[in-house]
Amino acid sequence: NTLRSRMINDLDFKSLDFVNKKGLKSNVNFHVKYLISSYKNYDEYRSNLNSKLMGIIELQTSYPLVKTSKKFINYLDPKISLRVNPSKMANSSNEERTINNNNIFNINRLGLIDTLESGNNLTLGIEFKKEELDDNSKYLELKLGTVLRAEDNNNIPSNSAINQKRSNIFGNIVNNLNDNINLDYEFSVNSDLDKVDYHSLGAEFSKNEFKTRFNFIEENGVVGNTNIIENKTSYNFDKNNSLIFETRQNRELDLAEYYNLIYEYKNDCLIAGIKYNKTYYSDRDLQPAEEL
């Protein structure tokens, strides 16, 4: 029999922003993890009580700029983050972790339970946003980010694409300027700019009580091996009653993964619904199933 027990304490500290006379904004952040673990009959761990203290120190600097015109307000925000962690990192190369522009500047961006990203690295990024003055829900947004490190770190999850000296370049574009059509595109390109490891294209159309959204997702190389198209369509009969249809097509296997048809009733106190689900396969087992 094997036995594993762990006690983990995490401490985060973020300083107040310091803004100089030229508008340069800086802050210092710490993330400390204290791990106490005990293992029995694990080949890769010593069978006794272990403790380890790890920490990341980060200096983050940005230079936010704003420009206003008659109809729009434009934001430009270049960022740089210097991180240092001298402690040793546990081998997490086989863990599944996704890095994108929503988490690349998080100090614990890998979200690993019992270890922290080690070594020295620079995270570079830039954000641009064009927003309507009269309606801030209508905007065009572009984000780019990448990671540079002193040396390769093979303990970092390989599918995160940030374990090499020059990581992938991560980006996303969102266009919400139209009343009825919203578009978003997310991508991850290798450092040589000759291979797209991940891209996702989303399109949403809404008119009155009708809304439909299509997503195309493709993963290649170190990120994964996925090629799917999915759709979610909904219609609100009134403020309480709606009908929802969902489906996903796996283009890699040339199979439909599922169809969902959902009737939903919703008020201030209650959400109730009836769901018909037809699944064509689950994971590696090609076992069709129907559920109501």
Question: For the regions a protein language model found, what residue spans apply to each?
Answer:
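Outer-membrane beta-barrel translocator/pore domains, especially the C-terminal barrels
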Residues: 1-292
